[in-house]
Amino acid sequence: MVKFKALYKGMNDDLKDAEMMIDYACEISKHEEDKALADEIAKYAQYRLEHFMTFHKLFENEASKEKNVDKETVSGCMWHETHEMFQHWYDDIERKIKKYS
């Protein structure tokens, strides 16, 4: 289960950092002289959001290899809950980044 833990932690860190960076970019962009810096920070937020999807696909692939992955199994339940939580979080960050742009 180490592989699931590693992928989960990576996805969690990607979303946490993406959200933090876009929030910083929004705050920094309020100062016209810092707009270029804010733009770079926003690009980094976008990169972390994109990287989340890379790990998400890897997680999906690994979960699909597990026998009897469904809501009745521990791994199936974990997958369902994790996927739903991350999807909502991802959507919120994506909206922030689009609003920034």
Which residues does each PLM region occupy?
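Non-heme di-metal
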Residues: 1-101
